[in-house]
Amino acid sequence: MQFHLIRKYASKVSREHYASSSVKIFRRVKPPQKVNKPKKPENVENGPTEYAENLVKVQMISRNLHAQLFPQAPRSISEQQVASAKVYKDELRRHGVDIESSAPVSDVQLKLPALRGANIEEHFHNIAKEQVQPYEELLLPLVQCEQLPKRPKRWAFHTGWTAYDPEDGTATPVDHPLEKGLVFDVEVCVSEGQAPVLATAVSTKRWYSWVSSKLTKHRLSVEKLEPLDVDTDSERPHYTTDELIPLGTTGPGLVVGHNVSYDRARLKEQYLTEDTGTRFVDTMSLHMCVSGVTSYQRAMLKSKKEPAAEDLGWLEQSSLNSLVEVHRLYCGGDTLSKEPRNIFVEGTLEQVRQSFQSLTNYCASDVEATHRILRVLYPLYAERFPHPASLAGMLEMGSAYLPVNSNWERYIREAQLTYEDLSIEAKYHLGRRAEEACSLLLDDQYRQNLWLWDEDWSVQELKLKQPPKRKPLPTVELKDSGNTPEERRLQAKFQHLYDQQALLPARRPLLPGYPLWYRKLCRKPPAKRADEILEDDEEPWSPGASEISTGMQIAPKLLSLCWEGYPLHYEREQGWGFLVPFRSDSEGVDRLPMEQLLAHCPVPEFARLSASKAESDMAFDMLPGQVEQHLGKREHYKKLSQKQQRLETQYQGSGVWCNKVLDDCCFFLKLPHKNGPSFRVGNPLSKDFLNKFAENVLSSGDPSCQAAARVIDIARMMSYWRNNRDRIMGQMVVWLDSQQLPNEFTGEKCQPIAYGAICPQVVACGTLTRRAMEPTWMTASNSRPDRLGSELRSMVQAPPGYRLVGADVDSQELWIASVLGDAYACGEHGATPLGWMTLSGSKSNGSDMHSITAKAVGISRDHAKVINYARIYGAGQLFAETLLRQFNPTFSASEAKAKAMKMFSITKGKRVYRLREEFHDELEDRAYSSYEASRLAIQRNRTLAEVFHRPNWQGGTESAMFNRLEEIATGSQPRTPFLGGRLSRALEADTGPEQEQRFLPTRINWVVQSGAVDFLHLMLVSMRWLMGSHVRFCLSFHDELRYLVKEELSPKAALAMHITNLMTRSFCVSRIGLQDLPMSVAFFSSVEVDTVLRKECTMDCKTPSNPHGLRIGYGIQPGQSLSVAEAIEKAGGNDVSQWDWIKKS
């Protein structure tokens, strides 16, 4: 049975396919003046004939490389191409692009291995097919197996693997399963840690079960590491390979599972340094490829409401990702029962023992369900993703491996101790502010405080018992009491206080005389005496506001925080906001300290002129400024009413109007939430607002409050560790004993430290766009001096004798989008303004895309970069407005709208309509605006689509790109441009004009993002072809790719990375009809060869938990950053075809 449908592409595409785009000019930018423009160098080594450039002055790859990569497409220039180039150059000049401004780069000469095919496209198909063939041979029998072997009636309860005879169910102990292709499921008893307790597997021949020794030997405690001391907290479990499941280490193996990365993390051989060849097929990832959903659709699937008619089509084509839902979608039948799982989640090991047979049957039923899903789902996947590189890339992504050593435990310990120290300091500062605020109770001074006026200042009195009515007892002075006369005098003086002890009530109030809000911050003193021993989990009691923290509602008030100068205030229904006065007098104001508010932030001029009651009724909705929380939702536009427009001129900050008035004297405006105006802010000291302090948008209104600045600094430092601590500390690290370590780890020169590994639980295709997902490592930030624990990635450290080699793909998505526009509109690299700026633009002279956009609109380059990428991903003008106001809160809504409109007119252009041919006789054949087209269609009583062709973008630097993206996205079966993968069925279903526009932003985003996934999969295939088994895949996140390789092979691996980039981009341009590649994108700017996982090999990763950096704190030296020329030199020459393993292949 053949599942891969191979599409043949012509090596040369007809020129008629690429129609020239007409571009309307909105403004002319003066070309940047180039001073001392360098001359094109003649390559000393290769000679002047190696240099090549195209008709728009974009430097192309060296001639020797072109001959090897595009052997059937010799370079030649026709008269028609020269004539077209004049048009392209004129358009580039009109958009302010100086094609003479780019500086050439040195040519590169390389002898590449021979292509495995007639051209680069056949080459990648053939090498990908070679890589997946061993696994397809194991996978296809499972897919074609209509009936699994009969499940055993009784499962053997003994340690290790047991095989069951398919005829009579006889149990036979085995070291590991005998077959290499398995459907597999693991169960874990959560209360006992992350190690597996039982597992089941099935092949086409027999069933297997595995039982942990903890289950059979009643050993309840998690084993501690004995061979090497990790020097760690004894409360945290540590795992060795003895607790994991062995699968064998010889030859290729295939494991199928649902969310199989969870099961993989419990397999013994996956933690060994050498790759075993076992790969994993995840039915959840296959489901995401075939029937994945947007975030909006996922919310609809979770909703219990009756779906709208327009949603019924895609609801039938998709589901949530759980095994139960996926099985229901593809297999139907009875719903799977998941009740036994509760014992694993909530129960104990003893309960698992008591229900061993039923729980093992539950595990086996999940295996059977996974197999049924595989039989239906894999043929769908193979049909929709025909290129073998897609499957090869998924298999490689599922083998991620992160080596660690004892420094991992040191990192966790240092980060946690620093976090606790900073927490104590923040608590101290807040406690001091709380104690100082209590003094406002005197003479009701709190009524004049702008932040604490609405807190509960009620106090409790200490009521003493009535003294008994009896005669005082005579005092008898003992001569030998030992007290001095002075002591006796003081005792007599204060005796009345000692006597009042008997008058205290049995149940004494907490802190009598203190306000209620303060008492809530304090703990009651314990009933135990001070000399009694505390329990292990009991904290010692301390007086004062010991329960206060930055996460409490009182904290922003104690710090006197302001937003844009206005005091913060909290309303239960609206969350955090701030007060803006609209009256200049305090008459009739009951509670609010109006005089102090007016002194702190005077009433705006507009309010002084019209301080009427009607002002409070004028509500306006700030222009949402966001495409949608999720691109799959329909966009809703709301016009501003006259009252709303009036209010917009009154307040020009970034607050969100919510029609709330306090004491008939001031407006309450909500703080802006990152998810939109319908959300409320729960804590202005959270990570989302920390940057606002640096911008002085959030600040303390009390100039004397030094504590506020320090608490804010501490909050900024703690946010990363607070949000990621549980995931980081919960990583399943498996430590290797000395017998499992290669000789390089245990030599005389090696330090006696522990070595282990983490198998990150990567979902190979976790999103609609097929991006991989993993909650810790794929979201890890780069280290920052003010971010506690952000050195996380650098704690992945290569063992002795190994190096981590990798690179960051430069502007991957931007290049993909621009080259699609170049090929579609011109058939020439860099012939569109966006294409030229991407390929030859330079940040240093301001000719790159982000610099030109920033200069034209009047914003910073960094902000322009974010908005540019958001636009390419499909976001609209409203989203750009929100970003502009988020970056610069001083922008008014009208200013942000004007800048966004200007940006979109310059970049995206104007949307125009062209008449269909049958209307040329009665109407002028020209470009019509949306309004004109709609009016003409209505006049003829026809739909827009009947009178006009699909609209196009015109006149912008990115018009050609968006026209091509929309053409792909609006097709009946959208496919990725490189590997031909299809869009999810959930977005293909019921594609009509309305549905098409509804999901268009998501579809455009899918074209770019899913194209980037194709690019990654091709890189993985190429690196495996060039380096074979000499590299082990570590991780890919964002646009970065990292491998583990032996130190002596690291220069060759670095050169292989450069060649991988060259060949992958060559394949991509060939698939869209271009037969050449620009030199600027042919190779990585640098490949990092390092001992730790960090973005740049020179980063020292200084953080609050690592103040001395890696060099001094850990003794880790900087790595090497190799250009292609340096990699060639260190690899021993430019003839890659002579590498030993390549010659043998």
From Swiss-Prot:
What's the EC number here? Answer: 2.7.7.7, 3.1.11.-
Q: Where's it found, cell-wise?
A: Mitochondrion
Q: Which reaction does it catalyse?
A: DNA(n) + a 2'-deoxyribonucleoside 5'-triphosphate = DNA(n+1) + diphosphate
Q: What is its main location?
A: mitochondrion
Q: Which GO terms describe its molecular function?
A: 3'-5' exonuclease activity; 3'-5'-DNA exonuclease activity; DNA binding; DNA-directed DNA polymerase activity; nucleotide binding
Q: What keywords were assigned to this record?
A: DNA replication, DNA-binding, DNA-directed DNA polymerase, Hydrolase, Magnesium, Mitochondrion, Nucleotidyltransferase, Transferase, Transit peptide
Question: Does Cytoplasm count among this protein's keywords?
Answer: no
Question: Any signal peptide, and if so, which residues?
Answer: none
According to its UniProt record, what is one Pfam family this protein matches?
DNApol_Exo
Mutagenesis or variant effect for E595A: Loss of mitochondrial DNA which disrupts mitochondrial morphology; larval brains are smaller due to defective cell proliferation leading to death at the pupal stage
What pH dependence does Swiss-Prot or TrEMBL list here? Optimum pH is 9.0.
Listed GO CC annotations: gamma DNA polymerase complex; mitochondrial matrix; mitochondrial nucleoid; mitochondrion
SMART domains noted in UniProt:
POLAc
**What result follows from mutating E813V?**
Partially rescues the defective clearance of paternal mitochondrial nucleoids in mutants
Effect of a null allele? Larval lethal due to severe defects in mitochondrial DNA (mtDNA) replication and synthesis. Larvae display a severe decrease in body weight and a 70% decrease in mtDNA levels but are able to survive on maternal contribution until the third larval stage. RNAi-mediated knockdown in male germline cells, results in defective clearance of paternal mitochondrial nucleoids (containing mitochondrial DNA) during spermatogenesis.
Instruction: Using the UniProt entry, state which stretch of residues is the transit peptide.
Output: 1-9
Which cofactors does this gene product need? Mg(2+)
Q: Name one GO biological process term.
A: sperm mitochondrion organization
Describe activity control.
Stimulated by KCl, and inhibited by the small molecules o 2',3'-dideoxythymidine 5'-triphosphate (d2TTP) and N-ethylmaleimide (NEM).
Q: Which SUPFAM superfamilies match?
A: DNA/RNA polymerases (SSF56672), Ribonuclease H-like (SSF53098)
Record InterPro entries: DNA-dir_DNA_pol_A_CS, DNA-dir_DNA_pol_A_mt, DNA-dir_DNA_pol_A_palm_dom, DNA/RNA_pol_sf, DNApol_Exo, POLG_palm_dom, RNaseH-like_sf
Quaternary form?
Component of the DNA polymerase gamma complex consisting of two subunits: the catalytic subunit DNApol-gamma/DNApolG1 and the accessory subunit PolG2/DNApol-gamma35.
Query: What biological function has been recorded for the protein in this entry?
Result: As the catalytic component of the DNA polymerase gamma complex is involved in the replication of mitochondrial DNA (mtDNA). Has both 5'-3' DNA polymerase and a highly mispair-specific 3'-5' exonuclease activity. At the end of mtDNA replication DNA ends are ligated to produce a closed circular mtDNA molecule, its exonuclease activity is required for formation of these ligatable ends by preventing DNA synthesis from continuing past the 5'-end of downstream DNA into duplex DNA regions.
UniProt lists the family membership as follows: Belongs to the DNA polymerase type-A family.
Name of the protein in question: DNA polymerase subunit gamma-1, mitochondrial
Gene name tied to this protein: PolG1
